[in-house]
């Protein structure tokens, strides 16, 4: 029983840490073509993509007024 609890806690912690990588992603393009020997070799074309996504306060509940996310204000920056 204890082994299952420890395994479940470790799996949950791993999923939480794996999701943290998505939260620190950057939308800036920073590619570089270094030491390219020809005219057409090593050309880099990157387009920075920024899509503001508002995901705070989006929960599903049966009774919306008792929801802890009710009344939250979210702003896209």
UniProtKB/Swiss-Prot annotation:
Chain ranges passing through the membrane: none
Biotech use, per record: The small chaplin mixture (a cell wall extract of an rdlA-rdlB knockout) forms a stable coat on a number of surfaces (including Teflon and cotton) and emulsifies oil-water mixtures, which could be useful in medical and technical applications.
One Gene Ontology CC term in the entry: extracellular region
Reported phenotype of the disruption mutant: A single chpH disruption and double chpC-chpH knockout have no visible or sporulation phenotype; a quadruple chpA-chpC-chpD-chpH knockout has delayed aerial hyphae formation and sporulation. A quintuple chpA-chpB-chpC-chpD-chpH knockout has a longer delay in aerial hyphae formation and an almost complete lack of sporulation. The quintuple knockout still expresses ChpE, ChpF and ChpG. Quintuple knockout chpA-chpB-chpC-chpD-chpH has strongly delayed aerial hyphae formation, makes many fewer aerial hyphae but no effect on viability of the spores produced.
UniProt KW keywords: Amyloid, Cell adhesion, Cell wall, Disulfide bond, Fimbrium, Secreted, Signal
Listed InterPro entries: ChpA-H (IPR005528)
Pfam families (UniProt xref): ChpA-C
Signal peptide residue numbers: 1-25
GO MF, one annotated term: identical protein binding
Induction: Highly expressed in 24 hour cultures while still submerged, during aerial hyphae formation on minimal medium, decreases once aerial growth ceases. Strongly expressed in aerial hyphae (at protein level). During aerial hyphae formation and sporulation on rich medium, under control of ECF sigma factor BldN; more strongly expressed when sporulation is blocked by deletion of whiB, whiD or whiH. Expression depends on bldB but not bldA, bldD or bldH (at protein level).
GO BP terms: cell adhesion
Family classification: Belongs to the chaplin family. Short chaplin subfamily.
Domain free text: Has 2 domains capable of forming beta amyloid structures, both of which are required for aerial hyphae formation while the N-terminal region is not required for rodlet formation.
Function in brief: One of 8 partially redundant surface-active proteins required for efficient formation of aerial mycelium; the short chaplins assemble into a hydrophobic, amyloidal fibrillar surface layer that envelopes and protects aerial hyphae and spores, presumably anchored to the long chaplins. Chaplins have an overlapping function with the surface-active SapB peptide; chaplins are essential on minimal medium while on rich medium both chaplins and SapB are required for efficient aerial hyphae formation. Chaplins are also involved in cell attachment to a hydrophobic surface.
Protein name per UniProt: Chaplin-H
Species of the source: Streptomyces coelicolor (strain ATCC BAA-471 / A3(2) / M145)
Phylogenetic lineage: Bacteria, Bacillati, Actinomycetota, Actinomycetes, Kitasatosporales
Gene that encodes the chain: chpH
């Amino acid at each position: 029983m204890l082994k299952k609890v420890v395994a479940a806690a470790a799996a949950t912690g791993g999923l939480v840490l794996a999701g943290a990588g998505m939260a620190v992603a950057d939308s800036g393009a920073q590619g570089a073509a270094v030491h390219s020997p020809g005219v057409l070799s090593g050309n880099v074309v990157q387009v920075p993509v920024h899509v503001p996504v508002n995901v705070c306060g989006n929960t599903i509940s049966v009774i919306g007024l008792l929801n802890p996310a009710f009344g939250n204000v979210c702003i896209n920056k």
